[in-house]
Amino acid sequence: MNNVQLNSDAYFHSASVNEMYTVIRRAADCSVKLSNNNQVPTADAGLDYTIPKGTAFVLTGVGTDPDNDPLTYLWEQLDNTSNTQPPVATATSGPVYRSITPSVLPTRYFPGLSSVFANNLVPKWEVTPGVARNLNFSLLVNDDKVTGNQAARDQTLITVSNAGPFKVTSQTTNIEYDGSVPLAITWDVAGTDVAPLNTQNVQVLLTRDGGVTFEVLAESIPNTGSANVDLPNENIATARIMIKAVDNIYFAVNSYNFKVKQGVLATVEGKLKGISIYPNPANNEVNIILNKAEDAKYMIYDLSGRLVNSGNLAADGKINVERLSTGNYVLSIQLKNGDKVNEKLMINK
């Protein structure tokens, strides 16, 4: 026998609660009924979903209570034991996710976010399936009233497909990014954009506290495998990117913490009055006109922060950009006195 842990936890599995209800209802005719004036809450486990294999996901339920009692939420896999334990990613049946203590939050990540952020999708008792299979989950909503609690239960079916794994392929090292420069992100679509998943759009999120909180960088962008998103232009010591399917429950996180350094765009842009850049979009040449004749340097960065062109600004203010490919760039102009301004530059060939 393989014990998940050496001690028990002080709660009942939803399957045990269901068995209790069955017995109580069966004995209802010969029992004495006493009201505890506690109304039954409601539980909604949400829709059934199809997700890619080898990919983390999150379940969020909804519970309401007519008495406005505080609720706890218990997400559990319901598949009967028919596989090797501890579970393995290749199991096509049986449980792969352990039961954990009920939470006041209606959300549970599979596996837990601490494992996801450690780049481990197969911890011993929360193993992400690497093969196509079905996963049955139960949501038990409990009002935990000490004078006689009430609970409600709902179920959802998660179908793991042969598509996947869906994963973030950028930000794979602990480096620092300029917050004033759009961040280039990439991910492996892995067949999630076609049937049976048909995920056409994804959401991009940023966390700076290891998944405790998230902020939206892009609400809905095409699921094409690459995009440029704007970062908060401030200093961030430990940032991670999450890319999550729109209208689905699966997601992926980049593999390493990275830093964000506040860039100059937001803080000194107003120092250079009268600057003019044209044409923008440009083809082979860009013209820079300053408010006064002054020595200046220019730097052009691509959206990954790589310097692709630089030099001293000529007297006529012309910059040759014929070697740059079509796309978006950041043009940085720095005067001799240290003042600096960044502007978005578009190249259209």
Where is each model-derived feature located?
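A short beta-strand segment in extracellular, disulfide-stabilized domains
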Residues: 53-63, 182-186, 285-289
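Extracellular (secreted or membrane-anchored) zinc-dependent metallopeptidases
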Residues: 1-138, 147-152
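Short, solvent-exposed loop/turn segments at the edges of extracellular beta-sandwich modules
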Residues: 142-149, 246-250
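Residue-level detector of functionally pivotal "anchor" positions at catalytic/ligand-binding pockets or at interdomain
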Residues: 30-37, 257-278, 284
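Short, solvent-exposed loop/linker segments at the N-terminal edge
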Residues: 45, 49-57, 174-181, 277-282
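Extracellular acidic, Ser/Thr/Pro-rich low-complexity tracts
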Residues: 51, 62-67, 143, 188-195, ...
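C-terminal outer-membrane/trafficking sorting elements
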Residues: 268-278, 282-349
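Conserved Ser/Thr-centered positions that define the repeating blades of beta-propeller domains
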Residues: 205-209
